[in-house]
Each structure stands twice: as structure tokens, then as C-alpha cells.
């Protein structure tokens, strides 16, 4: 990925998904990669980090507009009622994110 922090947090995200995926729904959303680099680069990233979570493509930028994405990465925690619980702009701290996931 052209996004260094995205690649940096990818292994921790994989780990958290493996540990919390049965209780918390994880969705990775690719905002620019498919448009600028092609779907092959997105697939390559997912395979490199062995992600098993769904990866959605925001080709029209609708999701990034909805959640006011202005930098990458961004992590959005949404509770079971669809309410945004917490937003992390930039690379997340794995320990902090794990504590927040445990509370959802």
C-alpha cells in the first residue's frame, strides 16, 4: 500500500480480527487503492497480510464522505445500534483498540 501507516497496522488488525471476529464485525474499506492502483493491488495487500475480514471498495468515495475521512488510516468503531462509538485518525494503538473492542 502507498499508505505506510495502513501497512504498519495491518498485522495488528489481522490479530484483533482473529481474536474478536466472533464478537465484533470487522470491515476493511479501501478508499483509493482500487481507483488509482487497480484491484490487483488491493488483492495483493489483503493476501500479503492474510486478512480474512471482508474488504469493501469505496470507489465513489461515499463511505469516506459519510465518515468525514480526511487522512489514512482511520478506524471507526460503530456499536450494534449503528452509532459511532469512537474514531481513531491515523495509526491505532493495538492495546487501546483492544480495550475499546472489549467494551463493544
Task: Mark where each language-model region is.
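Short, conserved active-site loop motifs that form the nucleotide-linked donor/cofactor pocket
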Residues: 24, 53-54
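Structural microenvironment flanking redox-active thiols in thiol-disulfide oxidoreductases
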Residues: 7-48, 59-65
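Conserved short-loop catalytic and cofactor-binding motifs
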Residues: 1, 30-33, 85
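Short pre-active-site segment immediately N-terminal to redox-active cysteine/selenocysteine motifs
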Residues: 1-2, 71
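Nucleotide phosphate-binding site architecture
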Residues: 4, 14, 85
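The canonical Cys-X-X-Cys-His
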Residues: 3-6, 75
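Thiol/disulfide oxidoreductase modules built on the thioredoxin-like
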Residues: 47-52, 59-102
Amino acid at each position: 500500500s502507498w499508505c505506510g501507516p495502513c501497512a504498519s497496522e495491518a498485522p495488528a488488525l489481522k490479530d484483533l480480527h482473529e481474536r474478536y471476529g466472533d464478537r465484533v464485525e470487522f470491515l476493511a474499506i479501501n478508499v483509493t487503492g482500487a481507483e488509482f492502483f487497480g484491484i490487483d493491488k488491493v488483492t495483493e495487500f489483503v493476501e500479503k497480510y492474510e486478512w480474512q475480514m471482508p474488504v469493501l471498495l469505496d470507489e465513489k468515495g461515499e463511505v469516506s464522505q459519510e465518515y468525514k475521512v480526511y487522512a489514512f488510516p482511520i478506524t471507526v468503531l460503530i456499536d450494534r445500534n449503528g452509532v459511532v462509538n469512537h474514531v481513531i485518525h491515523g495509526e491505532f494503538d493495538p492495546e487501546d483498540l483492544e480495550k475499546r473492542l472489549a467494551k463493544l
